[in-house]
């Protein structure tokens, strides 16, 4: 049976330092390996987010759907929705791939699947955080105004959406490790997340009968709350921050518990 390597002479701070170094090394490796280099990975994230923003900007403009947005910069409205959703989705997929595909590498001393979850997730955070900031600054240069009422709220809300995606990915990774039907569930779940995230919808204008279809999704709350922080003329009425915080906490705790169970179960089998 495989047992993790233990150094009897190691101290707590040595362990923290070694863990941080491993995290940094794996994160750099993920950033470079994703698209052949750190710069290419960043450009890929910017390009994908920009493409979606432009497509839906023209759709909403030419289809006369701008009234569904808030009073303010339509592109900022779309950038917030696209950026937050894709950051959470790509983090979820990264954590999922780490939970299901890193067990061979995790058999080496000091490594574990959760370390790969962290490194892959941090790589996604790095790419999409910078991508959103660049898109925002580029839009401000074109329009001549940088509309963001409470910029201090951007980082905590973006981090919360990132953590939510990581916890959901760990939970899905456990399901796909043990259940054959989890692959189909993941596909359906991703489609439902795409529809109910509210990235192109003003949450305040959704009819009450349709609200339950959206409010279960923590990303719906986070995107709407960020728009409330961004636009001076918009106040969220149908969303809050308590729900996504609770869901994110439960997903992260359950994800780490299930990871520990998977690790122990695999060690017993091997």
Region spans (language model):
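Hydrophobic transmembrane alpha-helices and immediately adjacent juxtamembrane helices
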Residues: 1-270
